Amino acid sequence: MLRVTTALALWCLVPIVLFTATAAEPAAELGLVTGSEKGTYYQFGLNLQALVKQAGIDLSVYPSKGSIENIYAVYQRPATQMGIVQSDVLAFVTRVQSDPVLKRIAKKTKMVFPLYNEEVHLLGRREITDFDDLADRRVAIGREGSGTYLTARLLLKVSEVVPKETVNIDTDEALAALKAGRVDAMFYVAGYPVKLFTESVAESDGLALIPITNKSITEFYPHAEIPAGTYAGQPNAVPTVAVKAVLISFDFRKRDCEMVGLFAETVAGNLPWLIKNGHPKWKSVDLAAPLKGWEQYDCVSQRLGKTGHAPTAAKPSGVNPVVDAIKEMLDK
């Protein structure tokens, strides 16, 4: 397994692996759709871009609204072969059997690698000390098309906590609204440390992370913890729940198989480089970890079996049926 301990032992081989990949393969062009420019997805994308450039792969990293947009983008945009999504988003999409497009997306979306746990950040006014306190409050739940939006709606539905108002705005807007008192709390699903909070939240803002310990929620989502001192004014660890970030591709057969396989080979052989030079969350990545309900893209598994080991956002085209289907199911 490509655990961190094994990966560190291979650190001295990094230059050799990169050189070999560069010499053996022609230059490749790939696109990766991520998330907010201040979120962990985007930082991971930039780390991957820097790594694979050394192997002759030109990786364009696109910001986006998040997981729901990303699933459809990988299916629909020719220059976007990969995306990062939350595990619960695709799990939810697979439940939709009435739409033929969604059925095809669910069937053909494949895992390149599992990445890391994404903690649910619930940031609010200091007087809000528990998830259940969101009842009768104004809560920002993320922009439609984001994984935060889906997870927030699922958590509220499962817990039967009913806010006074839910506000569909992106995380930058939500934080500004929270500071201005226009909302009382905001959701943000991302692996800590989140750049938006480390750069834009001060102790003087009077905000705090709200624990998520509701039993109805923890029956469905795995426990997680945001360590003490991760953010300003956070003296104690905060219990929460998490989802898994997953690097995905779409099984188009023959179109991008070789390029995605080369990309995966480069990443698998150079995890120590990412741990040393990338976002802190790379330290928790296990590229070989099993992930229930996900099948690894055979273009990746076959390639690894043989070897053993910021531009502007792409323009969306029209309506995203994934968003509409999710809203329809959650509103029932």
Language-model regions, residue ranges each:
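Pocket-flanking alpha-helical
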Residues: Q49, Y62-K103, A174-A177, P193-V201
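Pocket-lining segment of extracytoplasmic ligand-binding domains
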Residues: S87, Q97-S98, V161-D256
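Bilobed "Venus flytrap"/periplasmic-binding protein-like clamshell domains
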Residues: A27-K53, E118-A180
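Bacterial N-terminal signal peptides
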Residues: A7-L18
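Extracytoplasmic small-molecule ligand-binding "clamshell" domains
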Residues: A28, L32-V33, G39-Q76, T80-V85, ...
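A structural signal for short loop-to-beta-strand junctions that line the ligand-binding cleft
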Residues: V101-L115, Y231-V238
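Ligand-binding clefts/hinges and TM-proximal coupling segments of bilobed small-molecule sensing domains
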Residues: E144-L154, Y221-K292
